[in-house]
Amino acid sequence: MADTSPRTDVSTDDDTDHPDLGSEGALVNTAASDSSDRSKGKMDQKTLRRLAQNREAARKSRLRKKAYVQQLENSRLKLTQLEQELQRARQQGVFISGTGDQAHSTGGNGALAFDAEHSRWLEEKNKQMNELRSALNAHAGDSELRIIVDGVMAHYEELFRIKSNAAKNDVFHLLSGMWKTPAERCFLWLGGFRSSELLKLLANQLEPMTERQLMGINNLQQTSQQAEDALSQGMESLQQSLADTLSSGTLGSSSSGNVASYMGQMAMAMGKLGTLEGFIRQADNLRLQTLQQMIRVLTTRQSARALLAIHDYFSRLRALSSLWLARPRE
Amino acid sequence: MERIRDLSSKKAAVIFTKSSCCMCHSIKTLFYELGASPAIHELDKDPEGREMERALRALGSSNPAVPAVFVGGRYIGSAKDIISFHVDGSLKQMLKDAKAIWL
């Protein structure tokens, strides 16, 4: 028995201060001193078994430690990778929203998919706009400009289609504007821009306009503002009725036997939340209709300039946002 | 259907709504802003509301049943149509033609 275990020899030589066993932890030392108390130089079966168990425990502990360190190392690599991805995405102007939000929203993947789709849309838009800019600078003919303008309008329709699909999935993500830069978010109305505000910006840039065009754009600015106000009023009534629904029956109602009424209340509130999607859809419909009407009022060349001016405005707003985020802070 | 035809032709502008419908609230607001004072019929307050809702749904095909807007006794559409007609100026013209507004 003694010759099968390499440790036995060592412990008979010196059992109180054992360098090998000592490195394996306190348990081992206790076991070693135990054995020295009982009978010097001799180890019974029990002690041997205990020593073997200790060695096994120490071996497992070392393995666990090794696995743990490996895991840490993997996490570190993953983190570096994520940081690099985030950096790349930032450079491309993509906004990645907080993971916390997405974990909580049911359409977490939908939100991510929409963000990706939207950044692709933006990329395509940049290309179109570069084309439009060079065509304008090269004094291209109306027919050539018309084709590009129609392309841009079709691209806007595509955006509203993408948004409508995304709203079915995660209406709060769209309303939050987390897919836009912070500065754009500051001007957000019902998940997008206010057409009436854009028209105000354009007025100076489209000179010279005929009397008729001037009136057309002014009218359009007014009608889109009226429609925006009307939709905002509807949203207010939605909030009010949601608050009324949620607060009804919370006072004085006994805690027991009200599960059914609580569930009924929640079902009603859910129904009301469901109409949020309709508001986003109508707001986008308003945006599209306003752009289309603007183009009907303007000449082809003016339309091209207007679309470019709108595009440049949003580009600058996004650039401003990046500068603001990167500003030095004390 | 009979009752809808009846009610919708009694005034130049008529809107069928539900008291709980917030988009209806938006469309009503828009009409008031334009200076029209449409007759409002809330389906959930009408004893024949259910039948009327069914008839309106059939009328608007893909549209929701409410809001349902009639101008000059003619069905114009729901929220989407109203916003579109408002932006291109044709809603105002329809309201003028039906003598719901004068200016």
From Swiss-Prot, chain A:
Domain of life of the source: Eukaryota
Main localization of the protein described in the UniProt heading: nucleus
bZIP domain sequence ranges: 44-107
Record's subcellular location: Nucleus
Region of interest (Disordered), ranges: 1-48
Example of a GO MF term: DNA-binding transcription factor activity
Biased composition (Basic and acidic residues): 35-47
Keywords annotated in UniProt: Activator, Coiled coil, DNA-binding, Hypersensitive response, Nucleus, Plant defense, Transcription, Transcription regulation
SMART domains from the UniProt entry: BRLZ
Statement: the UniProt record of this protein carries the keyword Nucleus: yes
GO cellular component, one term: RNA polymerase II transcription regulator complex
Region annotation Basic motif: where it falls in the sequence: 46-66
Coiled-coil positions: 45-142, 217-244
Domain DOG1 span(s) in chain numbering: 111-327
Family matches, as PROSITE patterns: BZIP, BZIP_BASIC, DOG1
Tissue: Expressed in the whole plant.
A biological process term (GO) from this entry: plant-type hypersensitive response
Region spans: Leucine-zipper: 72-86
Record family assignment: Belongs to the bZIP family.
Cited function: Transcriptional activator that binds specifically to the DNA sequence 5'-TGACG-3'. Recognizes ocs elements like the as-1 motif of the cauliflower mosaic virus 35S promoter. Binding to the as-1-like cis elements mediate auxin- and salicylic acid-inducible transcription. Required to induce the systemic acquired resistance (SAR) via the regulation of pathogenesis-related genes expression. Binding to the as-1 element of PR-1 promoter is salicylic acid-inducible and mediated by NPR1. Could also bind to the C-boxes (5'-ATGACGTCAT-3') with high affinity.
Subunit (UniProt): Binds DNA as a dimer. Interacts with NPR1, NPR3 and NPR4. Interacts with GRXC7/ROXY1 and GRXC9/GRX480.
PANTHER family documented for this protein: TRANSCRIPTION FACTOR TGA2-RELATED, TRANSCRIPTION FACTOR TGA9
This protein's name: Transcription factor TGA2
Organism: Arabidopsis thaliana (Mouse-ear cress)
Lineage: Eukaryota, Viridiplantae, Streptophyta, Embryophyta, Tracheophyta
Gene that this polypeptide is encoded by: TGA2
Curated annotation (Swiss-Prot), chain B:
Keyword Electron transport: yes
Disulphide linkage map: 21-24
InterPro entries: GlrX-like_pln_2 (IPR011905), Glutaredoxin (IPR002109), Glutaredoxin_subgr (IPR014025), Thioredoxin-like_sf (IPR036249)
Family note: Belongs to the glutaredoxin family. CC-type subfamily.
A cellular component term, taken from the record's GO annotations: cytoplasm
Subcellular location: Cytoplasm
Glutaredoxin domain sequence ranges: 1-102
Keywords, comma-separated and alphabetical: Cytoplasm, Disulfide bond, Electron transport, Redox-active center, Transport
PROSITE patterns the UniProt entry points to: GLUTAREDOXIN_2
Function recorded in the entry: Has a glutathione-disulfide oxidoreductase activity in the presence of NADPH and glutathione reductase. Reduces low molecular weight disulfides and proteins.
Gene Ontology BP annotations: negative regulation of transcription by RNA polymerase II; response to nitrate
Name of the protein in question: Glutaredoxin-C11
UniProt source species: Arabidopsis thaliana (Mouse-ear cress)
